[in-house]
Amino acid sequence: MAQHGDGKQYMELDQSKGTEMRNKALMDNNMLLETFIQMSEKGRLSSNYMTVTAIVRDVEQESFAFASECGILDVSQKMLKNFKSLCAILRSIRPDASSNNAFAYWKEVICKWLCATLLSTRPDAGSDDGFAYWKEVIWKTKQEFRAKYPFPETPFAANKVDDVNTHSPKFVMEFIDAVVGNLNVLVKINDPSSLLFVPGPNEQTEQVLKELKLLRFFVCFVSNKCIEPQYRRTTFYTHALIEASHITMVVWLHFPIYGNGNQDLNPGDVSRLLSDFMEMKIKSIQLGISRNNIYIDVLKALKSTIPQAQNKHAAESGIEETPTHNLMVGLSDQMANLREMICLLRDNLIHLPILDLEFHVQDMDSVIVDAGLLFYSLYDIKGEKEDKTLEDINQALGFDIPRNIEPIKAMVYLVMQKAFQSNLPRIHGLGYVDFLLKNLKDFQGRYSDSLAFLKNQLQVIQTEFESLQPFLKVVVEEPHNRLKTLNEDCATQIIRKAYEVEYVVDACINKEVPQWCIERWLLDIIEEITCIKANIQEKNTVEDTMKTVIGRTSSQLTRTPRMNEEIVGFEDVIENLRKKLLNGTKGQDVISIHGMPGLGKTTLANRLYSDRSVVSQFDICAQCCVSQVYSYKELLLALLCDAVGEDSARRELPDNELADMFRKTLLPRRYLILVDDVWENSAWDDLRGCFPDVNNRSRIILTTRHHEVAKYASVHSDPLHLRMFGEDESWKLLEKKVFGEERCSPLLKNVGLRIAKMCGRLPLSIVLVAGILSEMEKEVECWEQVANNLGSHIHNDSRAIVDQSYHVLPFHLKSCFLYFGAFLEDRVINVSRLIRLWISESFIKSCEGRRLEDIAEGYLENLIGRNLVMVTQRANSDGKVKACRLHDVLLDFCKERAAEENFLLRIKWDQSTKPSSCVYSHKQHAHLAFTGMDNLLEWSTSGSLVGSVLFKNYDPNFAYNSCSSHAFAISRILPNFKFLKVLDLEHQFFIDFIPTELLYLRYLSARIGQNSIPSSISNLWNLETLILKDVRYMRRCRLLQPNTVWDMVKLRHLHIPYFSTEKEEALLENSAKLYDLETLSTPYFFRVENAELMLRKTPNLRKLICAIECLEYPPQYHVLNFPITLEILKLYRSSDFKVIPFCISAQNLKYLKLSGFYLNSQYLSETADHLKHLEVLKLHNIEFGGHSEWEVSNAKFPQLKILKLEYVSLMKLIVADDAFPNLEQLVLHDCEDLMEIPSCFMDILSLKYIEVDNCSESVVKSARNIQETQVEDSQNNNFKLVIVKKMVLKFDTSNEKEISKAFDRLLSLPGIQSIAVDSNEKKFIVIGDMDADEVRLVVGKLINRGML
């Protein structure tokens, strides 16, 4: 008998699939014919209706399984064997019949074979019309059934079948599975050319399928729960069998006869047949036994046995589907609310993890059984009288419907609430309450009608949340408060309530949850918030009476054992630290070593502390380990023990006497103190007073994970950030730990080197892996196995160390840190983008008077200081972090921990985990990061509560190779993510739509391919960051932006490539001001007046990148006033007219880049008068007028730090002595006309760097003169000069050997950085800081020798 998966062999047929697929189709239809042929051989098939009925009855008595095969598509093993034999014969007759063109031939051969078989039972039928005769017989038989078949009584109804197996629930479920499996075939086949195609719509067939599945669920539920006498269940199981068998007959009645195709039965007849079934034409299955009575009977049995029933999770038997079984028809108007509740129960059960439901299983069963009793009882009542009142119904049923509905309501609400809560992340951003409060105000204004009945509750909630804002501020600003754990727990509860409020309000607006449920839910939220506030106030009152000394007596001291083992690696570091300990300043000095966990800080410090050449220079040596939680007394006792020996009597002394005793012990002597594992500045404050400074070169070694602690403790020496191991050091450590004094076998060295490299240069990881290898056989196969499994093993073992650092993170930093798990391995992360994402995710808690971006930068610096994030690039001008990354160990931790916390799930393109496999664990995550489109499609049905969808791809070119089908697919599935706040598609593929239905969206980044943006984009009224990148980036086509964009008042960052606005003047005059907009790129202005209008509408702009095109000649020249907040301005020319038609005035501008313009000294001088705070000036592709000179007078750029000239046609730079008093960097790229760098640069004391790239020899010479003066005369040891020259050297030879020799000779010259060979044009391109005359001399010699 067919199971669910067996229907695959009946899938749609395609001519291109070949003969094999066509033979399968023939097999399906012909086997159906063969079934009836065998029946005719027994004399059972005739045109008489009663005879056919008897056939069905007899077949059922003989073999129920075989009867099922008569009505459905399944093929018995016997018939399959016959067909295989037939195929073997046919192949032997026609071996070449494997081609696609053989389809007609096979059809004809099989038909003739069938006709021959039929002729043996009907000799009077000729060979030509035999097949048509039997086809006609079957067709007429179907006609009689269609006209007269009333779904008659069967032997099962009279209990005449004694086979106990037919009454077993397993048999019933298997039979229903078979029918469902074969019905699925008909639904899926939609190719009219297929021989199995059923014409007409499939909606009713699908409804029949649903009814069968629900019946199967009910059977399963009853079999799991009911322990009543057997006869009760026998009646129910018999009924289930009969319903399924009737469906098999319905299927056969509308299945096409072979050869008739669509002409056998028109769609209307099919629809009527199915409608008859759906309208319950089966009125009874036995005289006096109502169909509903069967259900009522079995439900009553269930109700009486529920307390003793097996405690089996409801979802395992499909009970969430059971309440709606066959209830569409017969529900009275009064019961519509009940049906709505049961549907909500069903829909939410599938989102509820087992652990959250287990406690309520028996209550759930009871509620569902009660609901079923109500439903099936109403069937009978409706049939009797349509106008019965609710009182009449209550009296007829013997119970009170409103009272019976209340437990159902309570259970529905409980399941809905728990289903939502179970999917919330356990890590939250403190900024979520800020977002909710803003939205509550907006929602009440936009949807006042929908929310009218909740007005009072929403106002109370808003007031309560606002009153909690000061507490959330304390959580951020005082992360080490004594009540840290309590505060964080309360903060978590508050944010979870904010999530619930958002969900309930949205459900109310969209009519997704009934009003009674919403009101109950909001009242519960108000009550819970009140309890949270009371808890906070109570604990804070207690705290006011307590001392605020943090953690001094909370635990015993964790001592660090003395370590004398040989250290491997860090030889250069050790030597440097040794010099600092023995030499340097006469006063006390603190040698601070900081770095991420596992680098070996403690090992290194102990190595120095135990170095005899070091220790011998000090009078007293003592050490202590502070740890995260410490006892001040235990620290003092440990130090005294090392300094003067053990004395138990000291334990009785108070802390201040112990501290004074230790201070006096050190006072006259030179001491070396090791203070290990300091976590906070306060811990150092507690100890530093014990270490007197008497100018005798005493030293303190301090280790910490945090840069801020190391910097805080430093006195003279700068903190040492301990680097990671090099590859050579990694291998040496691994070899030492595994082999001791021996050497590694040559056979193992290659795999050993690979393992050492895979450890990520982290000493701790290397030691852990060495421990694994030490316990294994020294065989290549064993080591290869370790190498193959290294990623998971090493990271799992080292997780405890990272976990400790994570555990002590302040509450507000945990979500920021875990969010790194969304990024790809070994990728540099743009900090501006990261901060915008953090803000959009509500990780950043607002603070009055401070920008969210500034606060977020502080969060990042905190993570960097804790060595959890590595800086890869800082800005030259202000030192801000521009790019960062995570070590792989930390990144893996973020991914794993984020998944555990239900916070973020990263799904790779080849990941086997699908939402269906975790439907009862973590059905939804707050954030999903995908690497493939297929992943998103699989998860789209599980994304209703997902807050972020981020695409990451390992192929940087993927976005440009994506097909439009992806864009179409994602446009259909994105509405499923209704609570989406971040959608980052930038690195995946381009789209041709804007998802304007995502009302909560705050961050949208994508690549687009169209020429315009729809005006409906303003529907995204929560949008704060909009980044659209043009896939036509090579063409610089202008994008038309709708006027409605300027109505999006929450926008903070708007980045659209080269856009212009419809009817700019009218728009900008009438639109609102965008007070929150801080960065804008790249508007395209045709007129200066339009730019002025735009600037007036964006009064708080901080960064602007725009293109200017002036259509007037001569241009109207005046001062353009930019916002006083503007700090970065980049102007690009976008037409042939090169003059900037305005003078730039921006009093707080720090960064200015001009590209493509024609400038002169006067313009730059007048502009400089308005830019007194300018720190960075970049001129790119600029033409200078006035004899190609730029004259800069005194005090024109008083704050300028960086001056960069690229492709500037400037011959002479005339600079006054005090023109650039604070300049730090001068960069000249491809300024080929420039004659020299002015000599006044020699006297700029702040100058640190000059870079000359592809400029004249005179410029290089003047740069060297400046270097000489700066270094030798001014003692500016920090000055650096970089010379990059490019020389093009032609050659005539085509001899590759000679070219190679010349290449090697040139590369050996001093200062050569790289050489490129262009064989087609026969030239060398030489780059480096080389002596051009020397290069030419060498080239001349090569030519003379015939080598070039």
Curated annotation (Swiss-Prot):
Q: Which positions are tagged coiled coil?
A: 446-469, 561-583
Q: What is its main location?
A: cytoplasm
Positions of the HMA domain:
1284-1348
Q: Where are the LRR repeats?
A: 977-1001, 1051-1074, 1123-1147, 1151-1170, 1171-1194, 1197-1219, 1220-1244, 1309-1332
- Could you name the Gene Ontology cellular component terms for this entry? cytoplasm; membrane
Q: GO:BP terms for this protein?
A: plant-type hypersensitive response
Where does it localize? Cytoplasm; Membrane
Q: Where is the NB-ARC domain?
A: 552-848
Membrane topology term reads:
Peripheral membrane protein
- Give the binding site residues for ATP: 595-602
Miscellaneous remark of the record: This protein is encoded by the haplotype B genome of the allohexaploid Solanum demissum.
Write out the function statement from the record.
Answer: Confers resistance to late blight (Phytophthora infestans) races carrying the avirulence gene Avr1. Resistance proteins guard the plant against pathogens that contain an appropriate avirulence protein via an indirect interaction with this avirulence protein. That triggers a defense system including the hypersensitive response, which restricts the pathogen growth.
Family the UniProt entry places it in: Belongs to the disease resistance NB-LRR family.
Please give the name of this protein: Putative late blight resistance protein homolog R1B-12
Organism of origin is Solanum demissum (Wild potato)
